[in-house]
Amino acid sequence: MNSIDDEILFIGTAEAEHVEMYLKAIWHLNESNSPVKISTIAKMLHVRQPSVVQMLKKLNTKDLVEYNKAGVSLTENGERIGSSMMRNSRLLEVLLDSALKVEIDEEMVCGIEHHMNKQFTDALCTMLKHPRKCPHSHDIPMGECCENIDSN
């Protein structure tokens, strides 16, 4: 009865998570009206500046950012992914803090947020009654499930 065929395992791609973290960092800088600088991104993500430059070039070729001498900005696709990652993260923080009454573990939140699909995120948002703010008082980007809901 206990067969290896009963268990389905997945190996996530670190590359996809790295892309999402860069987009989330840029999205957060935009949200806070901070300049999007290589040094700031490097500091936020605890990486070296050459790593940021290399990733920004990659994101530029994937049409997720516009990166040139003038600076860095998110494309429509980059904005969508960055907003989605921030939504996932902040909803998880509300879950931990308000619903489960446990201390927010940012590393755990970061690990989970990359694996949340739209159905799960919308169900979590609905279960939490469509919160508008995370425990840190930041706005939670609205999803389609929030469109017909009055502001809390």
Regions found by a protein language model. Give the residues of each.
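Short, hydrophobic-biased segments on the C-terminal half of alpha helices
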Residues: 56-57
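A short, conserved structural fragment
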Residues: 60-70
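Basic, amphipathic "hinge/linker" alpha-helix immediately C-terminal to the N-terminal HTH DNA-binding motif
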Residues: 70-88
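Short alpha-helical segments that sit at the start of domains
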Residues: 1-24
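Key DNA-contact positions within bacterial/archaeal DNA-binding proteins
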Residues: 50
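Short acidic, hydrophobic short linear motifs in intrinsically disordered regions
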Residues: 32-42
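C-terminal regulatory/oligomerization modules of transcriptional regulators
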Residues: 111-152
